[in-house]
């Protein structure tokens, strides 16, 4: 499948997603498989979680649109899934959901020897991130934070 065909396929799938209030996160074609595999990752436009029923709901009209478009002249398998849980915390919802969970905070302090801090997610405000490091609360200004990721803590 060439770039133009893939672009047409993505546009077609976007139309189906828009009708159902979903957003296409990615479309991955595995043309080395027989039949080829089309992996589509979707999310809801309102930020709610994607369920198995949502994937099934998207599958039928997506399959029909692909068939009606005659873009693919061969058999294919359509796989619909959600984004899943990312290790990186980015949204307000992530910070509420994972409060108390172990996190790794990557710092952008160029002159400091400390590049990472590990602790339990305690609080997030608009100005700082607070983590619990062995019972002590450490407030880190957001301008010093590069990335916040879930991790596992070892004693």
UniProtKB/Swiss-Prot annotation:
InterPro entries attached to this UniProt entry: Ribosome_maturation_RimP, RimP_C_sf, RimP_N, RimP_N_sf
Superkingdom, taxonomy of origin: Bacteria
Keywords of the record: Cytoplasm, Ribosome biogenesis
Keyword Cytoplasm tagged: yes
One of the GO BP terms on file: ribosomal small subunit assembly
Function: Required for maturation of 30S ribosomal subunits.
Protein name: Ribosome maturation factor RimP
Organism the protein comes from: Prochlorococcus marinus (strain MIT 9312)
């Amino acid at each position: 499948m060439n770039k133009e065909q893939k672009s047409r396929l993505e546009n077609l799938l976007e139309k189906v997603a828009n009708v159902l209030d979903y957003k296409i996160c990615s479309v991955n074609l595995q043309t080395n498989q027989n039949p080829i595999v089309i992996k589509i990752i979707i999310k809801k436009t309102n930020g709610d979680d994607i369920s198995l029923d949502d994937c099934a709901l998207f599958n039928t009209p997506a399959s029909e649109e692909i068939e009606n478009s005659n873009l693919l002249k061969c058999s294919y398998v359509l796989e619909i899934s959600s984004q899943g849980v990312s290790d990186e915390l980015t949204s307000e919802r992530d910070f509420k959901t994972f409060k108390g969970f172990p996190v790794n905070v990557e710092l952008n302090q160029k002159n400091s020897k400390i590049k990472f801090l590990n602790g339990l997610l305690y609080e997030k405000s608009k100005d700082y991130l607070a983590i619990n490091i062995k019972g002590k609360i450490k407030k880190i200004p957001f301008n010093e934070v590069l990335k916040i990721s879930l991790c596992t803590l070892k004693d």
